[in-house]
Amino acid sequence: MKVLLVNGSPHKAGCTHEALQYVGNELVAEGIGVDEFWIGAKPIGGCMGCYKCAERGECVMSGDKVEEFLAIADEYDGYVFGSPVHYAGITGNMKAFMDRAFFSNQGRVTFAQKPAAVVTSARRAGTTAALEQLEKHIQYSQMFQVGSRYWNMVHGAAADEVAKDEEGVQIMQTLGRNMAYILKCIEAGRAAGVPLPAPIENRVATNFIR
């Protein structure tokens, strides 16, 4: 089993990376493989709403971190998406990354029925609002959202300050253990012949105005 930690910060080794490492260390201790994917600091174009992905099965915008991520995403059994807080929300690059990665993937089963978690980091405030943004992609995509003993956030203005947020560190550690447990439960269920929930046939999309 493997989990992919997605670092949505423009700083490769900043506070978000530190938070993800605490999660990852617990996963490794439980025998779960871990890799980290950094979305980078180069601009990522946002979704244009062209719906070409519905025809092509992939986003028309290519050659960036979204394409690179989707090329490997199928290999993983779970995901942790992290972002720093910019103006009480996730970074602009992370928003563009998440929107395109998830929306262009709707016709495939990369994410459905896999566990996922989200984490945020900030100097002071805005973490809960940013968490809610990330959670939307998880909840929409039929994933099993993993929680901890508090909202999944750490605080610090620099990477070395995250360790001083002792409660935040424990929240990340608990999250890692919970993620490992869910992964093992899914594996045990599969081995015991317990199937994952069957999809609803003939999915309906109802517009509010028609």
Pin down the residues of each PLM region.
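N-terminal beta1-alpha1 ligand-phosphate binding loop
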Residues: 2-30
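A short beta-strand-loop structural module common to alpha/beta enzyme folds
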Residues: 32-42
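Cysteine-cluster motifs in flexible loop/terminal segments that predominantly coordinate metals
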Residues: 42-74, 204-210
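Helix-loop-strand module that forms the ligand-binding subsite of alpha/beta enzymes
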Residues: 58-150
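Glycine-rich phosphate/pyrophosphate-binding loop and the adjoining helix
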Residues: 144-210
